[in-house]
Amino acid sequence: MLFPTSAQESSRGLPDANDLCLGLQSLSLTGWDRPWSTQDSDSSAQSSTHSVLSMLHNPLGNVLGKPPLSFLPLDPLGSDLVDKFPAPSVRGSRLDTRPILDSRSSSPSDSDTSGFSSGSDHLSDLISSLRISPPLPFLSLTGGGPRDPLKMGVGSRMDQEQAALAAVTPSPTSASKRWPGASVWPSWDLLEAPKDPFSIEREARLHRQAAAVNEATCTWSGQLPPRNYKNPIYSCKVFLGGVPWDITEAGLVNTFRVFGSLSVEWPGKDGKHPRCPPKGYVYLVFELEKSVRSLLQACSHDPLSPDGLSEYYFKMSSRRMRCKEVQVIPWVLADSNFVRSPSQRLNPSRTVFVGALHGMLNAEALAAILNDLFGGVVYAGIDTDKHKYPIGSGRVTFNNQRSYLKAVTAAFVEIKTTKFTKKVQIDPYLEDSLCHICSSQPGPFFCRDQVCFKYFCRSCWHWRHSMEGLRHHSPLMRNQKNRDSS
């Protein structure tokens, strides 16, 4: 019997240490099966003078004379308990503990941890409500020790009360569902920070690869316009496709240094595969343009191609492949731009960005394809890197708004030629612009949907696209490579 009944209380007073020991042993708790006298003779003598009320305000370890536990001080033991439990009444020199034991907290009455009840089950109910996993956070300053069941019980009850409060607190989303007829201001969603602060950037990056997962809305098939070059000037960078799988950078340099000094660029190369080309192709960057000419002269090619595009092949070997033909794709600088009407003024607002271009597609061919599909093409340009080699994207300008919108609406076009088949992606060409909503912040995000078709800053994007029916819009951003390209 842990607590005496009311009849016994008047004659015996508060329980002594032996009664508490028997009660705690009946709970089958670890560490309570030993007599208290084995801890310390001095501390056991002092512990018998403590009352049950002092145990509620102090850790059990202090009552037993044990070193203090290394828990963080919990404020609810001081202030929260005073608010939740009525203050004990003073009767002479004794404190009556029955009001505390009979009191209830403000948590639901059906809860197992809603407070203490009268009788000998008080501490047993409290112990049974403890949550062992996950434990309450604490700082161990002395290397660990026994946990305070009273503090853990109060912390468990506080967690349930906070969860109950969160369950009844209406959120903006639940408010809009509860009253569907009410007009909810779009800035409701702005009160909650997005889970990922770069979610717009992530969506914009994903959109750049949209051609790989979307179906083409229209198809162009035919023969590319012929190419006639007179003393062409090449980029110092060439594409090398179909290289041996076991080739190394040193092997490439040894093979091609006979044409001049060069370096090797391996797209996708990382520390896991430092020896082999991860994608089966590399780029060779020569110091001089004449080195590219010498390489092309050493290649086998077919100059009688119907479209005038010669395919160059070079034979090389590796450690495990004695002879392998690799394809060499150079780039003529004149293929980077095509102007149909030199006197026509180019309007950036009627310019589209074309991505996922094939390496054999030059500016003139791109202009011819989009002019056949949409009409009104006056300019086409291929984006290049610092070596003036294509990076797989381009720009096309129209002379009328109708053709421009038709191209933007098409979005994905499949190009079929005798040499290759490629699906390209068409988006509005983006410039540096202020936000079209607030006109005070830069607008790096563009919405290509015809309902919006504006530049947005981050805040205005979240505000605008929090409205129902606009959340599916995909953002566009300028690619950093396009900023550095010429």
Curated annotation (Swiss-Prot):
Residue numbers bearing the Phosphothreonine modification: T97
Marked site positions, Important for the positionning of RRM1 relative to RRM2: W331
Family indicated by similarity: Belongs to the RRM CPEB family.
Biased composition (Low complexity): 102-120
Binding site for Zn(2+) 2: C447, C452, H465, H473
Region (Disordered): 87-120
Gene3D superfamilies in UniProt: 3.30.70.330, Cytoplasmic polyadenylation element-binding protein, ZZ domain
Subunit structure, interactors included: Interacts with kinesin, dynein, APLP1, APLP2, TENT2/GLD2 and APP. Both phosphorylated and non phosphorylated forms interact with APLP1. Interacts with TENT4B; the interaction is required for TENT4B-mediated translational control.
Record flagged with keyword Disulfide bond: no
Gene: CPEB1
Domain notes: The 2 RRM domains and the C-terminal region mediate interaction with CPE-containing RNA. The interdomain linker (411-429) acts as a hinge to fix the relative orientation of the 2 RRMs. The ZZ domain (509-566) coordinates 2 Zn ions and is probably implicated in mediating interactions with other proteins in addition to increasing the affinity of the RRMs for the CPEs. A continuous hydrophobic interface is formed between the 2 RRM.
Keyword field: Activator, Cell projection, Cytoplasm, Membrane, Metal-binding, mRNA processing, Phosphoprotein, Repeat, Repressor, Ribonucleoprotein, RNA-binding, Synapse, Translation regulation, Zinc
PTM comment text: Phosphorylated on serine/threonine residues by AURKA within positions 91 and 122. Phosphorylation and dephosphorylation on Thr-97 regulates cytoplasmic polyadenylation and translation of CPE-containing mRNAs. Phosphorylation on Thr-97 by AURKA and CAMK2A activates CPEB1. Phosphorylation on Thr-97 may be promoted by APLP1. Phosphorylation increases binding to RNA.
A Gene Ontology BP annotation from the UniProt entry: cellular response to hypoxia
MF-aspect GO terms: metal ion binding; mRNA 3'-UTR AU-rich region binding; mRNA regulatory element binding translation repressor activity; ribosome binding; translation factor activity, RNA binding
Region of interest (Necessary for stress granule assembly and correct localization in dcp1 bodies), residue spans: 255-486
Subcellular location: Cytoplasm, P-body; Cytoplasmic granule; Synapse; Membrane
Bilayer-crossing regions: none
Task performed by this protein: Sequence-specific RNA-binding protein that regulates mRNA cytoplasmic polyadenylation and translation initiation during oocyte maturation, early development and at postsynapse sites of neurons. Binds to the cytoplasmic polyadenylation element (CPE), an uridine-rich sequence element (consensus sequence 5'-UUUUUAU-3') within the mRNA 3'-UTR. In absence of phosphorylation and in association with TACC3 is also involved as a repressor of translation of CPE-containing mRNA; a repression that is relieved by phosphorylation or degradation.
Source species of the chain: Pongo abelii
CDD domains, alphabetized: Bbox1, RRM1_CPEB1, RRM2_CPEB1
Name of the featured protein: Cytoplasmic polyadenylation element-binding protein 1
Residue ranges of coiled coil: none
Lineage: superkingdom: Eukaryota
One annotated Gene Ontology cellular component of this protein: ribonucleoprotein complex
Domain RRM: 236-328, 350-431
